[in-house]
């Protein structure tokens, strides 16, 4: 049994996430985790809420709540929405946990011990009207690289360029909007990434199987311009992980906290520990996933994220791991995604533009969204969500192909043989050809899933569904029944077994529909079809079943138009 560690980029706590966030990290990570579990691998699937930094402080202030209260409430909101979308995390943690405090302070202490921390006096933006230093994300302005007028002081979300606040044109306070700013001296800790550049570059060069999107971004930040720069890892904030050197005070750093992008990736490790704590397991239970000297040498670690997160996961977090000098597990494969756009523009949490996860679930079940998002995942380039395309894909793929097959075969069997799988007949050339075609397609599906090629996997799965419809149309058991009831019984028996097969193969994409199909077939048999012929005999003659409710209702033109109108503006 292979062991797979999977992490999804952890979402900011500042509100409910939109569909672009979902398809860029959590959803494809869940797809992969479900697939690997279905193939009998040992999987640890981790995510969390990212609760520190400017977004949390600003959102709590806007909500009029203490930040700790706000974060606790929003964690539960995000966790519930994740459950409703079928995201099968083994643990959904919190970056504000005690585990993350201890681990973050531990890593900082080790980095300092190994000479990779520098204390730097820098000049930072201070808002006179707000009476405080403004961390990067508290400052907005125009990006000097692309001209986007809502760029933040750490990164432009439009062109993804990493920025310093002083780079912005016409900067203003994100708290008050004041332009009454000045630059003052303050002291901070810097991670000496430049000293680790050669080791990081060699590590990236060794990853010859990574997606081009991932490696191109990593190499850009590693080599372009002045190359990899040292990065500040502390901030003048009240909320966050206090700066300590392991478990000891850090002189001169009193009142400061670690930068959110230093502690957030460490939460992957901390969340694994949180999960073990919750289950009452010893430390060895989580360390076997993360420590090469304690059992993690046989773990394959895959990360999922949007392309804007790639620099932090290919440079800064590996610098932390490598610089610690300890045998922590480095990522083996980073699956990164481009952007999902919305009706000609960008999805945006900060701007409230697009369809958000709670809104999506209020109008349609999760599987509708899961299927469209994964089958249109922005892998090789940006993808665009339009209501027309959403309607067409759902109606054609889910209703006309899969749903239609399940409905036709179960209803026909009930009408001619009752609600038990009929006996009689034996396979002929048509069935043998179907088994061969299914075997070829399923092996291709496995290959695409093994390599985390999401869109190709979806296309192959749909082709597998189509084979069932084509067989049913060609075999026409409703006609065969008139002259050869035994042969019709065999055709129906094969068709009903196909439903179980489809449920198993489809579960990573549409888990709720898969559960419904298995429930209708009155089986808990989720065995993977390594042998397709055997899989099509899993449910024997005499096995009872029920005709399920409609798996997928079609989206009407009226509903499409209503939703398009409802979500054309910004979220209030």
Swiss-Prot record:
Keywords, alphabetical: Aminoacyl-tRNA synthetase, ATP-binding, Cytoplasm, Ligase, Metal-binding, Nucleotide-binding, Protein biosynthesis, Zinc
The EC number of this protein is: 6.1.1.10
State whether keyword Isomerase applies: no
Q: Which cofactor does it need?
A: Zn(2+)
Q: What does the entry list under GO cellular component?
A: aminoacyl-tRNA synthetase multienzyme complex; cytosol
Record motif 'KMSKS' region, residues = 346-350
Question: Could you say which residues bind ATP here?
Answer: 349
Share an example GO biological-process annotation for this protein: methionyl-tRNA aminoacylation
Q: Which reaction does it catalyse?
A: tRNA(Met) + L-methionine + ATP = L-methionyl-tRNA(Met) + AMP + diphosphate
The organism's place on the tree of life at top rank: Bacteria
Subcellular location(s) of the protein:
Cytoplasm
The record describes how the cofactor is bound as: Binds 1 zinc ion per subunit.
Q: Which SUPFAM superfamilies match?
A: Anticodon-binding domain of a subclass of class I aminoacyl-tRNA synthetases, Methionyl-tRNA synthetase (MetRS), Zn-domain, Nucleotidylyl transferase
User: Which InterPro entries does this UniProt record tie to the protein?
Assistant: Anticodon_Met (IPR041872), Met-tRNA_ligase_1 (IPR023458), Met-tRNA_synth (IPR014758), Methionyl/Leucyl_tRNA_Synth (IPR015413), MetRS_core (IPR033911), MetRS_Zn (IPR029038), Rossmann-like_a/b/a_fold (IPR014729), tRNAsynth_Ia_anticodon-bd (IPR009080)
Q: Which residues form a coiled coil?
A: none
Motif 'HIGH' region residues? 11-21
Q: Name the positions where Zn(2+) binds.
A: 143, 146, 156, 159
Main location (coarse class): cytoplasm
List the molecular function annotations (GO) for this entry: ATP binding; metal ion binding; methionine-tRNA ligase activity
Q: How does it assemble?
A: Monomer.
> What role does this protein play?
Is required not only for elongation of protein synthesis but also for the initiation of all mRNA translation through initiator tRNA(fMet) aminoacylation.
As for family, the record states: Belongs to the class-I aminoacyl-tRNA synthetase family. MetG type 1 subfamily.
This chain's protein is named Methionine--tRNA ligase
Name its species: Paracoccus denitrificans (strain Pd 1222)
